[in-house]
Amino acid sequence: MKQVGNFVLFAFLLLFTFTSCERKSGRKDSTSMQQEQIYDYYVQVVGITDGDTFDGLTQDKIELRFRIYGIDAPEKKQAFSDKSKIYLSDLIYGKTVGIKVQKKRDGFGRPIVWVYTPEGKDVGAEMLRAGMAWHFIEYDKTQQYAELESQAKKNKTGLWNDNNPIPPWNYRKKNK
């Protein structure tokens, strides 16, 4: 009889463990949602370099620097660089984000990736929508990113509020 009681207790604890990932609203927490979404891998964001580059800790505890695909944020000495960096930090710092690899590495050895918040938002799109980066059309031809930049520009959002914002690729050429 004692074995039956132990089995029932074990089954109850097992059931409780698997159902505890559910919130009272019936929605799953972000960990459960992440497991259902399809990403190449997940990283814990541990550092923000600028508005398009961040450091992430893999599940194997390896720290890597990533470059966000499709956007180009102001360089460190450029106007609006601090605001762009802070905006990216507010979006992803300290969070576990989903990563889809676009290309193996850029010229600095960084993996170029699409990044998704725990809620599933495309971080590159969010940076463009907020006017915190340029659409990097040299490498990305998607209509969505072009439209987001155009809308931010039209609304004078973020860096587009400046009279003459200088794209980072022009800034880099000028300041080699």
Question: Which sequence ranges carry the predicted segments?
Answer:
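Small beta-barrel nucleic-acid-binding modules, primarily SNase/OB-fold domains
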Residues: 2-176
